[in-house]
Amino acid sequence: YNKPFSYETFNGQIALITKDVYLKVGGYNSEITWGMDNENEELGRRIIKKHKLLLDPTFQVKHNFPGFNKLTKTYFYRVSSWMLVFMEDMKFESGGPAALDSGLAALSVPIFLLFLTIGLIFNSIFIILCFIFLIIWLNGYIKFFRYVLTNKPKFLVQSILLNLWFSSIISFGAIWGLLRWVIGHRVIKS
């Protein structure tokens, strides 16, 4: 992405919105249960019904990430909560980590590992399936890995290992969120 594009999540920490639009859509929803951590997604979905919401990739912010364990938990629960928003309208975001291609790439990692394990233990035919999911994963993240290789080549191996880890965590978070939705959890309690 080299220019602003339509997006679905209103990122309250760094976003701009006119007072008029904010009031028209009703602002943040106070009925969202505490701890869900998806008020930005829910507000964004209401904004895009009648207004344009853009993400400008030329804006950059500095991220201060917590430690590894905290980041792992945050990713898991964040994706789990996002799944409740997703199940409301079954729409992926147009870009970023909640886009369809990113989701498929992340989901392919645990499936790749599953087929690799089955192939090594039981039948090598599963190794073929393993490579299919490896290709899906690589296709989803190849631009990122090229960027790392160009800008921080010494970080490439760590970025691949971290991506494998966090893709798995994201996948398990999505599955957990789907299970929560199936048993009745919703973004807004009725």
Model-flagged regions — what are they?
Residues 1-20, 33-36, 61, 70, ...:
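A recurrent flexible, glycine/aromatic-enriched loop bordering the glycosyltransferase active site
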Residues 65-127, 148-157, 188-190:
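Basic/Trp-rich segment in TM-proximal cytosolic loops or flexible interdomain/linker regions
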